[in-house]
Regions:
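Small beta-barrel nucleic-acid-binding modules, primarily SNase/OB-fold domains
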Residues: 2-179
Length: 179
């Protein structure tokens, strides 16, 4: 009987710890900081541009493929797919920006990898967000938003301005993104 009492008491204590002890009618909502998911910036070195939204960068001596978070550029290297409108310009711009950069940094925000094993990150070039530069010039659309990323609002503002001016992909969106 003593063992049963200990098990029951342990169960009740565990239940109280899990649910919390609150007066009736009190609602509980955990405080979650969006900032907590955003990492500190890490220095990277340019290795190779894959296309407009993907590059190989070296971090702490190891080379990784980075997919730029929250943007999509027209295709240039997708198998069995022709180069899309503005795809080459987006790729050339990314390569140029990364190649001439004095300082490249990466910053994680949420999931660190995608389903293909590529690293997902914000890419900073000489203190400026590369994704925002791509969007401002009309080389990329804001895309693949899976949650509240730190710089999404900045990108959406830049996208609205680029659309309004019909820059880059916004001149012929269906040719840039035919699917």
């Amino acid at each position: 009987m003593n063992k049963l009492r200990k098990v029951t008491l342990s169960f009740i204590l565990s239940l109280l710890l899990i649910t919390g002890v609150m007066p009736a009618g009190t609602t509980y909502s955990p405080v979650v900081s969006v900032e907590a998911a955003v990492s500190k910036k890490q220095t990277a070195k340019f290795v190779k541009a894959v296309d407009g939204d993907t590059a190989k960068l070296s971090v702490k001596g190891r080379t990784y493929t980075f997919r730029f978070l929250a943007v999509d550029t027209p295709e240039t290297v997708k198998p069995n797919t022709p180069v899309a409108f503005m795809g080459k310009r987006a790729s050339d711009y990314t390569k140029s920006e990364l190649k001439k950069a004095k300082k490249i940094q990466i910053q994680y925000d949420g999931n660190k990898t995608d389903k293909y094993g590529r690293k997902l990150a914000w890419i900073w070039v000489d203190g400026k967000l590369l994704q925002d530069k791509l969007v401002k010039k009309g080389y990329a659309r804001v895309y693949y938003i899976y949650g509240k990323y730190k710089y999404t609002d900045t990108l959406k503002t830049s996208e609205r301005k680029a659309k309004k001016k019909k820059l880059g992909i916004w001149k012929n969106y269906s040719a840039a993104f035919p699917d």
